[in-house]
Every structure is written in C-alpha cells, then in structure tokens.
Curated annotation (Swiss-Prot):
Catalyzes the thiamine diphosphate-dependent decarboxylation of 2-oxoglutarate and the subsequent addition of the resulting succinic semialdehyde-thiamine pyrophosphate anion to isochorismate to yield 2-succinyl-5-enolpyruvyl-6-hydroxy-3-cyclohexene-1-carboxylate (SEPHCHC). Homodimer. This is 2-succinyl-5-enolpyruvyl-6-hydroxy-3-cyclohexene-1-carboxylate synthase. Pathway: Quinol/quinone metabolism; 1,4-dihydroxy-2-naphthoate biosynthesis; 1,4-dihydroxy-2-naphthoate from chorismate: step 2/7; Quinol/quinone metabolism; menaquinone biosynthesis. Its cofactor is Mg(2+); Mn(2+); thiamine diphosphate. The lineage of its organism: Bacteria, Bacillati, Actinomycetota, Actinomycetes, Micrococcales.
Amino acid sequence: MTSQDSLTSIGAARIAVTALLDGGVRHVVVAPGSRSAPMAYALAEAEAAGRVRLHVRIDERDAGFTALGLALSTEAPVAVVTTSGTAVGNLLPAVMEANHSAVPVVVISADRPEELHGTGANQTTIQLDLFGDHVRFAVDVPAGDHPQKAVATALYAATGALEDTPPGPVQVNLAFRDPLVPADGDALPAAAGHGVFHYDAGPQALNLPAASGELAERRTVVLAGHDAGPVAEAFARAHGLPLLAEPSSNARFGRNAVGPYRVLLAHFGPDSPTPIERVVLFGRATLSRPVASLLARESVVSAIYQPVPVAWYEEGRRRETPIETLPELADFAGRGSAEWLDSWLLAGAAAQHGLDGVLAGEDLANGPSVGATVWEHSRGQLVLGSSNGIRDVDLAGQPHPEPIATVYANRGLAGIDGTIATATGIALGSGRETTVLLGDVTFLHDAGGLLLGHGEPVPDLRIVVLNDSGGAIFSLLEHGAVEDSGAYGTAVERLFGTPHSVGIGALAAAYGVGHQTVSTTAELAAALKSPLKGRTIVEVRVDRSGLRALHARIKEAVSAAVGQVLTAG
C-alpha cells in the first residue's frame, strides 16, 4: 500500500469496528488511552448507532476479566481494547484463563507505528505474541493498513472455526499514527438507542433414550467436572448410574445426583465389596484429591466424553480414553444395576445427614454451611470463586431436583484474580440476577472490580464474601499439619494464612456499593432471599481457627453414617 493509499487512523479503526460487529461482537470493554483513541471514537460512533454496547474500565486487568465474563454469559466473542505498553500486559491473566476455558476474548491492542519502535518512544514495546501460546491467533496490522481481513481471521479463530482448534482468545495488534482523533466536522451520529444485547438461555435439562437392556451391567459412575453440561445428568439418568457432579458442571441436579460424593469414594474403593469399576468423565474435574485419586486407580477403567476439541487436554497426557459419540460412550459405560445406584443414593443420603448434623450443631456460620446455604438459595446465575468457596459448595451443597441456576467459575487456571470483574461481566451479559460467592482474599485481590464509572451499566450482583481474615484453604492442606506441629512457629500463618484486618464495609462504602454483615446461616438465607437491585455485598464473618477440626468432625460423622447404611445393606 502506498502512502497515498494508506488509511487514516480513524478510518482504519472504523473498518476494524465494522469487522468486529460483522463477526458477532456485541460487547466491547474499553480501557482509556491515547494510542487506542481511534478505536474508542469508532466504537462510540457504533454505540450511538445502537450497534454495540461499550463498557469502560480504567484497570486493564479488570477490563480483561469483564470481557471474559461477558463472553461466558453471552456465548459470543467479546473484544477488549487497550492502549500500548504495560496496558496490554495487564490482560495476560484474563487471556490465560480464557485460553484454558476456551472463551472467545478478542484483544485489540493499540500500538505505536513501526518507525517509533526501537527509538525509546514512550509506551513502546514488542506487543505481538506477548500472549504466546495462550492465544489461538495473533496478528500485527501496520499503521495505515486495512485491518478487515486481520480482524475477520481473528474472530474466525476465536470462535473455534479453525479445524481441530477450540475457541479461545486472540490478539489483533493495531498500530496507529497521528492524528488519533476524528477529522474536523466528524461527530457522533444521532443516538439510535441501544439494541438488546442480553443473552438469557437459563439453566437447562436434557433427555436421552433409556439405555438398552442389552448393555452389560457395570459398576460405573458418571463424573461431571467443570463445564460438563446437562448432558452428563441426562446420561447418568438414562443409564441408571450415580452422578458425581461438581457445582460448576451445571449437571448437579436430578434423582441420580449424589451430594457429598467426594467423602464416599473411599467406601467404594478397591478393597470394598462393590468397588467402582469404570468412570465416565464429562468436562474437567479439578476440585478434590479424592476424585484425582479415583481417576488414578489402576483398577478403574475410565473414559472422557470429548465430542469437540478442548483447550486443556493434550492427547496421551491422561489415562482416560477419549470418546467422541454418545453411542460409543454408552457401550463403554454399560448400565447400572438397581442395587448399584441404590447403594450410592443411600450412602449419599446418609453422608448428607451426617454432614448436616455436624453443621446444625454449629452456632455460627462456617465455610461448609455458607456453601450449602448459598447453593440452596441460588437462582438466576451463580458464580463461585476459586479456593474454598467452590469446594464448600461441592462438599455441602445438596443437589436440586431440577436445574435452578446457571453456574460459572474460572476453573481454566483456577486463579483467584478477576473474580468480581468476571461476575460483573456475567451479570451484564445476561441481564439476570447474579450471586458470586468468594473468600475475603479473593475479594481483596479484585477489589478494583467494584469500580464502575459514572454512567456505566450497573449489574444486579450480590457479592457474598466469606470473611475469615485470611486464606483458610491452606489449613486443610499439608500446611495445616505443619502449623499444628509448631515446627515453623508463626511462619505458616504469615506466609499462607495472610491475616489482615481490612474493613470490607468501609471499602464497600468507598466504591458506593451496599453492604451488610451476617454471622449465622439464618441471617445469610434472609439476605439471599431479599430482592436485588444493583450491587450489594453480604459479608459473612467466620472464624477459621477451627476449620481443620470441623472438617475432621464432618469426615468422622459421614464415615459412621455411611458405614451403618452400607453394612446394613
């Protein structure tokens, strides 16, 4: 392209915006910056015309996670626009999560023109391939070049249209020369109102034909990991098999679902009268060591249902046999006998009874009781933060008869960063009431996610913070035993517990977000049932000093209750 043919920066930006919209983008998150100004102006024009919804964030890390949440709830590509320099690097955590979760986040990174690189020019660095293998596609568009093909190809890759490639993040690095503002005489078009950019599928259940009586009877369990979907529940029901479903599987419901399954696995171990023979895995199981141990048992044959490529799986790296079709999976799984399913359901009911009995004896709220209460009262959309929150729900949340909420979690890399921003994006993308459960450390890590500028869309978002003044999860791992031994003094508490005394109420007030404090599950249940408009924080103050002992009592009570049932059977 000759200099006479080169596009102005605003002209190139308008073409890029048109290509984004043509590719299905309806939400764009914009972080302020001068080099990205052409994109900002072009997007403002598109928003005024009612063609796109913009979300402005001053923190690029939160911009990235907001885009991630929007893409999760709308099931469509979402773009995030930044200026040059470190602004682009702040997107890395969200891009990493999007990669491992196969979420189509489109990074539009503005850049200095080629002649400024290597000169020491301000905010100028190598931005192409900054995200390495975490993006499906990355391309440089030099200043003045036509960006349509680059943007279209990026969207093609982001949405999983490339052969044998799952959806995921992409990067389009657009260089812009001065002038970075519209030409004299340009102006926003007359406001045409906003289009409807919400996507609301809601929780779903599926039906599959009952398993053929010719299938062999096998002691198979259906394990539904993250993002398994309702097909896992339908398969378990059709084959008469126990369903062991993580909360973010969106399959933790129905008559075959077993609640506290992870504390039951030892009762159906290799030395039991009725050991598990086979496992059918839907989605990705990430939450507990008992499940990891089950999948590693030499005596257990396992398969993973994988109809399309997934981002986290490399062939030959796992023990499970990948199976692409449900008929093949049916042949592998067989069907469960009535005795096999009943033994699991009876054991599950006994375990739930034992667990509930321990929790009922506690005067104040604790992690498992908060998880159970949030799960019981979930509706609309539920976002579960990493660390203990999602595991508390997995342990104590009793499966519902039918799906009542769509559940999300950042389980791609299971980091605690960006959880508030992700939940905000999820709520804005659907327009539905959303509750997020997270710990105080996760909350503080993304406190900036509470910041919404004047005039920005405000979601209906309830933020439940389990505040135990630090990181309780480490006390349930090997580090808890090290602390109990006293061999390292206070080092374990300092390095892993990370105690603090932040006033969450004061922090909420600073951001203009409502706040209330509760200390019992009854108070929490009342807060969860209250009508929700806008954003509010429900802080549940708990003491983590006795958490390790509480889990020991739960394990003992469950073991006794289940032992009685299985012995009687």
